[in-house]
């Protein structure tokens, strides 16, 4: 779960 969240934030 955290991995997906971090990936989304990195995409921004």
Curated annotation (Swiss-Prot):
Q: Where in the cell is it found?
A: Secreted
Q: What name does UniProt use for this protein?
A: Venom peptide PPM3
Which keywords does the record carry? Answer: Amidation, Secreted
The taxonomy runs:
Eukaryota, Metazoa, Ecdysozoa, Arthropoda, Hexapoda
Q: Which residues carry this modification: Leucine amide?
A: 12
One GO CC term of this entry?
extracellular region
Q: Which branch of life, at top level?
A: Eukaryota
Tissue specificity comment: Expressed by the venom gland.
């Amino acid at each position: 779960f955290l991995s997906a969240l971090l990936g989304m934030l990195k995409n921004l």
